[in-house]
Curated annotation (Swiss-Prot):
Protein's UniProt name: Exostosin-like-3 homolog
Source lineage: Eukaryota, Metazoa, Ecdysozoa, Nematoda, Chromadorea
PANTHER family reported for this sequence: ACETYLGLUCOSAMINYLTRANSFERASE, EXOSTOSIN LIKE GLYCOSYLTRANSFERASE 3
Matches recorded under Pfam families: Exostosin_GT47 (PF03016), Glyco_transf_64 (PF09258)
Membrane-crossing residue ranges in chain numbering: 15-35
Length: 814
């Protein structure tokens, strides 16, 4: 019984294990079934209800029991794609914002410059307003009449006048009268009639009745006027009148008083092309002496001829056989020095000496010379007392060659300006009288411009200029001030004394009152800081380029310049040239000389910040470039070709340089003259010395335009017009002739080509041949080549200078 129990217990244990395993399997299956049932979609739930249920779920993770794995993945992909799209769009927006930010950052310096420019304009306007307030109360009125000093009308035999005041009644010559002149003849010979016509042509303020005249000129052939009155000029074309008690000013060759005018009115003029050249220096004779005075002992001059010399010393005792005019001129023209003795033929020989380039050695300290109280004859002649005749040979041989050539040149210039022909002599006499009486001439507008657009100088229509203001890469060029004209006719009375020497001996143009003066006196530099002298000055504050660009500074009051732009058959090129000048500081006006005489211009041209005036001309003439048009209201003139492309900073630099060198041509392309073989040639090759500046881009004083048009030899202008070339060479010759100075080159520019221009004068095959010939012809006309060499150019002070970080250069590129 016990064994069975044990056996039954062993069989019971495995059955329990099996039962437990089966139970475990049952629970697992049950759990799986329950799990599947819970995640299955009940058949009674529709798809729409399920979608609605999903859409209402806010927390996907907490409600995943409503989704299948596939749906979850698809939804997550959709969300990811949406987020990526949003990120892409945001990135694009960020890039756009960054671009705008960079553009704004880039514009900040330009806007700061614009702000500085506006501040400069406001400051300039405020200064101008203050200046106008200070000057608005100036009373302008005509001067009072001169005092009428009581005079006794003595008979000529009772008193001898010894000064100008004894024979001039100033009450008839107000300073505002412009010196009215009456002219008539006492004797009716052919010479008197010719002189009458000459005076009537040159007198600027001619009156028909003597009672309205300040000065009365009586032309006579050796006969004194029977009715001697005050303010009379006796112009004698005959034998000298000996009447030292006369109340008239005598104009004759001899027998004169201190206030008379010693002039040979019958001197025979010779064509200028026949004048003896200044070079070569050596001449056949060293000294020539013509002895006309029979009262002198001819043997007294033997010591002079005995002096040792490599060149002859010629002494001629005058007689009717060997003293013809031709013989005298031949002797004078072949001599370096002409010794002149006081005689009846003194003025004839004196003028011939000046004309033919023989240095006059005047053997007298008392001999009067033409207009000697105004003309400095020391520059062209040499005086010696007769007692120094034995020493004269040593004295003249000590002269430097350069001094002798300069005396020849100045003597020739005096002759050609004041004494060469009847018209010049009459004009010089009137100028001398005007200086003695201190009366300005009337303003004569000889160059009144004709508007191109009917009665208007400006175009009927204007086009907007799209060119932005040129600040030259963060460099301000100057404030855009309101237009200001140069003060004209400011030296109407100081010209008679302070500037008298310059007018008669340097610029040699005293015949008319000047609109401007090239080298007028400058105030001390500190004048710009004193209340009573600061008007017009624009001082530069301490600093470097930033301060420099805000004001004009310099040694003179503020001023502007006028562009004179010559154009012919290139409308598109002209339009581009005008647009490049937009917003250019210190520009007063642009004058376009329209050389297209065969057609009218278009009605539409660029509208700039200053007026653009078009002038109609009568012919296509290159000389039109240098006409002193009345529309030019500034001293500074920028002569431009329509095909010249300059940076604005280059123009401003050249203007600043010109302000300190007003008597010279200041510009860009340089040229020079060079000798090859026996001839002189025009040369445009690169060189280290130059003698000319092309006037297609150059600053010139307006006075030189007047000199070019009215004082330069007319045959030069005629040649320029005939060949349509060389006007720039002619201007360089003229300025160097008047100043004996070379032009000034600025910046490194050597050529200024126009890539878009299909036609140009310099492209002609004969261009250089014409210019070679021009130089030779002009040299012949002047009697020498006046061009001077220069071996430097002008750049701004801080150009190529290393500066600290907090400093700025004057200009960026020049």
């Amino acid at each position: 019984m016990a064994i069975k129990l044990n056996g039954s217990s062993r069989s019971f244990v495995p059955s329990l294990r099996v039962s437990a395993f089966l139970i475990f399997i049952f629970f697992v299956i049950t759990y799986i079934i329950i799990y599947n049932v819970s995640f299955s979609e009940p058949s009674w739930i529709t798809q729409d209800a399920l979608k609605q249920n999903i859409e209402n779920l806010d927390d996907y993770d907490a409600s995943c029991s409503g989704y299948s794995i596939g749906r979850i993945l698809r939804e997550q992909k959709r969300i990811l794609a949406s987020v990526r799209l949003e990120l892409t769009e945001s990135q694009v927006k960020i890039e756009e914002i960054r671009t705008v930010q960079e553009e704004l950052q880039r514009l900040i310096p330009q806007k700061q410059l614009e702000l500085s420019a506006l501040e400069g304009e406001i400051e300039a306007a405020q200064r101008q307003l203050e200046e106008l307030r200070e000057t608005q109360n100036v009373k302008v009125f005509l001067p009072f009449s001169p005092l009428q000093i009581p005079r006794e009308l003595e008979q000529p035999s009772q008193i001898s006048p010894n000064q100008l005041d004894d024979i001039i009644d100033y009450s008839r010559c107000s300073i505002s009268s412009f010196m009215p002149v009456y002219v008539d003849i006492i004797t009716s010979g052919q010479s008197e009639k010719e002189w009458l016509n000459v005076f009537q042509e040159v007198i600027p303020n001619l009156v028909e009745t003597p009672d309205k005249a300040c000065i009365k000129i009586h032309i006579s052939n050796g006969i004194a006027s029977p009715n001697t009155t005050f303010n009379s000029i006796l112009f004698n074309v005959g034998s000298p009148i000996i009447n030292f008690q006369s109340k008239s000013i005598h104009v004759q060759a001899s027998k004169i008083r201190s206030f008379d005018f010693p002039v040979d009115v019958n001197h025979i003029a010779v064509e200028k092309v026949d004048l003896t050249p200044l070079l070569p220096f050596q001449r056949e004779n060293l000294i020539s002496l013509i002895v006309d005075n029979t009262e002198l002992n001819f043997s007294a001059f033997s010591s002079l001829s005995a002096e040792p010399s490599r060149r002859p010393i010629v002494i001629v005792k005058c007689s009717q056989e060997n003293c013809s005019l031709e013989r005298r001129r031949q002797l004078i023209g072949s001599s370096t020095f002409c010794f002149l003795l006081p005689s009846e033929m003194f003025f004839q020989d004196f003028l011939s000496s000046l004309q033919l380039g023989c240095i006059p050695i005047i053997l007298s300290n008392s001999q009067l010379l033409p207009f000697q109280d105004l003309i400095d004859w020391r520059r062209a002649t040499y005086r010696l007392p007769l007692a120094r005749l034995p020493e004269a040979h040593f004295i003249v041989q000590s002269f430097e060659i350069s001094d002798i050539i300069e005396m020849r040149r100045v003597g020739r210039l005096f002759y050609e300006t004041y004494l060469a022909d009847r018209h010049l002599l009459a004009r010089s006499l009137l100028a001398a009288l005007r200086y003695k009486l201190q009366i300005p001439t009337r303003e004569v507008r000889r160059n009144q411009a004709i508007p191109l657009f009917n009665s208007s100088f400006t175009a009927p229509k204007g086009s907007v200029v799209n060119v932005q203001a040129n600040f030259d890469d963060e460099y301000l060029l100057g404030p855009l001030e309101s237009r200001v004209e140069s003060t004209s006719y400011a030296y109407n009375f100081t010209e008679f004394q302070l500037y008298s020497y310059d007018f008669w001996n340097i610029i040699m143009s005293p015949h008319y009152t000047k609109e401007f003066l090239v080298n007028a006196a400058e105030l001390p530099t500190e004048a710009e800081f004193f209340e009573d002298t600061k008007i017009g000055f624009r001082p530069i504050e301490p600093g470097s380029g930033a301060e420099f660009s805000k004001a004009l500074g310099g040694n003179r009051q503020r001023e502007q310049f006028t562009v004179v732009l010559l154009t012919y058959e290139r409308d598109a090129v002209l339009t581009g040239a005008l647009e490049r000048l937009h917003q250019l500081p210190y520009l007063n006006k642009i004058i376009v000389v329209w050389n297209n005489v065969n057609r009218d211009p278009p009605d539409t041209w660029p509208s700039l910040h200053i007026p653009v005036e078009f002038i109609r001309v009568a012919e296509n003439n290159l000389n039109n470039r240098f006409v002193p048009w009345d529309r030019i209201e500034t001293e500074a003139v920028l002569s431009l070709d329509d095909d010249i492309d300059l940076m604005q900073q280059e123009i401003i630099l050249a203007f600043r340089v010109w302000r300190e060198n007003r008597d010279r041509i200041v510009g860009f392309p340089a040229r020079h003259h060079a000798r090859y073989g026996d001839s002189m040639f025009y040369n445009s090759n690169h060189t280290c010395q130059m003698s000319m500046i092309l006037t297609g881009a150059a600053f010139i004083h307006k006075n030189y335009l007047t000199a070019y048009t009215y004082e330069m030899p007319a045959e030069i202008r005629e040649h320029v017009n005939s060949i349509k070339n060389c006007e720039d060479i002619a201007m360089n010759y003229l300025v160097s002739h008047l100043t004996r100075k070379p032009p000034i080159k600025t910046t490194s520019r050597w050529t200024l080509k126009c890539p878009t221009c299909t036609e140009s004068l310099y492209k002609e095959g004969t261009h250089f041949e014409k210019r070679h010939e021009c130089m030779r012809l002009f040299t012949k006309i002047y009697g020498y080549n006046p061009l001077k060499f220069s071996q430097f150019r002008a750049d701004s002070i801080l150009f190529k200078t290393r500066l600290p970080q907090n400093h700025q250069k004057c200009f960026k590129y020049v």
